[in-house]
Curated annotation (Swiss-Prot):
Lineage of the organism: Bacteria, Bacillati, Bacillota, Bacilli, Lactobacillales
Binding, Zn(2+): C412, C415, C430, C435
SUPFAM superfamilies (alphabetical): BRCT domain, DNA ligase/mRNA capping enzyme, catalytic domain, Nucleic acid-binding proteins, RuvA domain 2-like
GO BP annotation list: DNA repair; DNA replication
The protein, known as: DNA ligase
Cofactor(s) of this protein: Mg(2+); Mn(2+)
GO cellular component: cytosol
EC number annotated for this UniProt entry: 6.5.1.2
Top EC class, one word: ligase
A family per Pfam: HHH_2
Gene3D superfamilies: 5' to 3' exonuclease, C-terminal subdomain (1.10.150.20), 6.20.10.30, BRCT domain (3.40.50.10190), DNA ligase/mRNA capping enzyme (3.30.470.30), Helix hairpin bin (1.10.287.610), Nucleic acid-binding proteins (2.40.50.140)
Length: 674
């Protein structure tokens, strides 16, 4: 919350606070949308976002196009082909109380001059998805991306059972909806992640996003994603006049639509709907985080239009977080793979959002101090993203007399070494490279599916190997023998042979798996692949300068600094030597990006307008991008070529005024044949 009302800030104070809020929000957006690994709850993000909105409303001159309040959605992932959305996929405005929702309805009625019917829908907690069909056949699936340009995830969408590959009628159309992960599938996925030494997903939304954006469609297929479709683009083509009719029309074509949508003509009906699903949401097999109101009349939707970021004809009501009261009996500190020491509250078991909760993350020492959380305190819990239990506040009035502040450790709970703060980070960290807890986490991570993929080497086996002093680092894995493994509990000949075979097979992995498996700070699987493909082998990466690494697309200075620091360590250099001597592959042997041959559009910025006899616009866009073109949605001085079909309209006129070269469909076909 702001220290005072936005209108009481001086311009200088407001500017400083705006810059601070934008920096923080952009970091959280990166974690949420691109890394699929949020570090704060939706409520914390929303509070900061509304503070920024308030300051920008008080001082409009501080609004910039790159402000989080002006941008839509995700940062584009360079691993996927880009898709230009012919009609932008906008975000959605939101409110956080029924009073705010009623005020929005009053403004709506005032604007249009009469009462408004709304189609009321559940707000599915997932990832926005666009599907394009030609003659009834699915030809493209894409994410929202930044609203104008998304990611082509067609191969992954084809693995989702609820997405029809062929419609019940041979129609050409675009629909939009939500890709989500059911609660049961999320529980199975996180159980598998933990068994294989991976990091559990924070919530089903991030699990869905991470699963849909997999480079390997087989991984997506195993994640049990589902969809609800709720938007029909250009419905007038099909004589559909209301949102409720659109949902019925899409359902008749074979799409899965949510059965809970209904038309409401007044706020009393909407209030009843909200109360019903506030109560029943935990019983649903999928996550929802609110209710969506959409003007039901599609012609009125078109009349109301959009702002830069959101439609004026729809709004989301966000549920308040559900809370439960409990007592903290202990705070335990655990050491992670990178040495970060994290506190967890151990509490009386309590029912919260449909599950029994007995532990909750406290994140870091600063949170314990800021909220003054003490052992013995009565606290209120909520579930961040409806999944992760967190302490929302302390009920100080119920605190026992003379309860001391919670002790913050000065030494590592695993190895006893003094804990430190690196740079200006909040986390406490153990920097002992031989810390047993870290080594166990590192070994488990190294063997995980997305790293070296050593099947059968999970946390329990790693713990046994450590306890029997058979391994002290990842290089030791490659010196294990059948006699060594025979010392493990319940390890017979078959298990021994399977594990030795998996370890031996991992020697041949392309080096990006090794880079990821080493657990370098900030280096995830995608960054590891980019680095491996760019440098070709580990030796070139190890000897590259920080500047050279930072210049690699999508890497940047933070990752570059972490890599240089990591490989400077004598213990790391010794480890790499040992891996080399164990015949572990250090070269990139994965697929390389195809080089686009010279074509009439290679490297050019192209705009498409009008209707074509031989192409749909999405198919033509995809074909031109495959030839090396950058296809955009508007004509400017930077446009190299306009491809104009029939009824080209204003884009053709603008291109002519700017002397942009223009190509018709006949000329286009001739060029494509060359």
């Amino acid at each position: 919350m702001l220290a005072k009302p936005a209108a009481q800030f001086t311009l200088e104070e407001a500017q400083a606070e705006v810059e601070k809020l934008r920096k923080q929000l952009n970091q959280w957006r990166l974690e949420y949308y691109t890394k699929d690994a949020p570090t704060v709850t939706d409520n914390v993000y929303d509070d900061h976002y509304r503070d920024l909105q308030a300051l920008e409303e008080a001082y409009p001159k501080l609004v910039t196009p790159d402000s989080p309040t002006q941008e839509v959605g995700d940062v584009i992932n360079s691993d996927f082909a880009k898709v230009q959305h012919p009609i932008p996929m906008l975000s959605m405005g939101d409110v956080f109380s029924f009073e705010e929702l009623s005020e929005w309805d009053a403004r709506m009625q005032s604007n249009v001059g009469h009462p408004v019917d709304y189609n009321v829908e559940l707000k599915i907690d997932g990832l926005a998805l666009s599907l394009i069909y030609e003659n009834g056949k699915l030809v493209q699936g894409s994410t929202r991306g930044d609203g104008n340009v998304g990611e082509d995830v067609t191969r992954n969408v084809l693995t989702i059972a609820s997405v029809p590959k062929q419609l019940k009628q041979p129609l050409s159309l675009e629909v939009r909806g939500e890709c989500y992960m059911p609660k049961a599938a999320f529980a199975k996925l996180n159980a598998r992640q933990e068994t294989e030494g991976g990091t559990p997903f924070a919530n089903p939304r991030n699990a869905a996003a991470g699963s849909l954006r997999q480079l390997d469609a087989k991984v997506t297929a195993a994640r049990e994603l589902d969809t609800f479709i709720y938007t029909l683009i250009e419905p007038e083509q099909f004589n559909v006049t209301t949102q409720h009719e659109a949902i019925a029309f899409m359902q008749a074509l074979g799409f899965t639509t949510n059965p809970s949508s209904e038309v409401a003509g007044d706020m009393q009906a909407i209030d009843t709907y909200i109360k019903k699903y506030t109560t029943d949401r935990d019983a649903l097999p999928y996550g929802i985080d609110g209710i969506v109101l959409k003007v039901n009349d599609l012609a009125l939707q078109a009349q109301l239009g959009n702002t830069v970021k959101v439609p004026r004809w729809e709004i989301a009501y966000k549920f308040p977080p559900e809370e439960a009261e409990t007592v903290i009996h202990d705070i335990v500190w655990t050491v992670g793979r990178t040495g970060v020491v994290t506190p967890t509250a151990v509490m009386d078991p309590v029912q919260l959002a449909g599950t029994t909760v007995a532990r909750a993350t406290l994140h870091n020492a600063d949170m314990i101090r800021d909220k003054d959380i003490r052992i013995g305190d009565t606290v209120m819990l909520h579930k961040a993203g409806d999944i992760i239990p967190e302490v929302s506040r302390v009920l100080v009035a119920k605190r026992p007399v003379d309860t001391p502040p919670a002790p913050i450790p000065e030494a590592c709970p695993s190895c006893g070494q003094k804990l430190v703060h690196l740079d200006d980070e909040v986390a406490l960290r153990c920097i002992n490279p031989m810390c047993p807890a870290q080594v166990q986490e590192q070994l488990t991570h190294f063997a995980s599916r997305n790293a070296m993929n050593i099947d059968g080497l999970g946390p329990k086996i790693v713990a046994q190997l450590q306890a029997k002093h058979l391994v002290k680092d990842v290089a030791d894995l490659y010196h294990l023998t059948a006699a060594d493994l025979a010392k493990l509990d319940k390890f017979k000949e078959k298990s021994i042979n399977n594990l030795l075979s998996a370890i031996n097979n991992s020697r041949q992995n392309s080096v990006e798996r090794l880079i990821f498996g080493l657990g370098i700070r900030h280096v995830g699987g995608k960054a590891a692949r980019i680095l491996a493909e760019h440098f070709g082998d580990l030796d070139h990466l190890m000897t590259a300068s920080q500047e050279a690494i930072a210049d690699v697309p999508n890497i940047g200075p933070t990752i570059a600094e972490a890599i240089v620091t990591y490989f400077k360590a004598a213990t790391v250099q010794k480890l790499i030597t040992q891996l080399r001597e164990a015949d572990v592959n250090l070269r990139y042997t994965g697929p390389t990006k195809p080089v686009v041959k010279d074509s009439f559009v290679a490297g050019k910025t192209v705009v498409i307008t009008g209707k074509f006899a031989e192409f749909s616009r999405p198919a033509l866009t995809k074909q031109l991008e495959g030839l090396g073109a950058k296809v955009t949605g508007s004509v400017s001085k930077k446009t190299d070529l306009l491809i104009a079909g029939d009824a080209a309209g204003s884009k053709l006129a603008k291109a002519q005024s700017l002397n942009v070269p223009i190509m018709n469909e006949t000329e286009l076909l001739a060029n494509l044949k060359d």
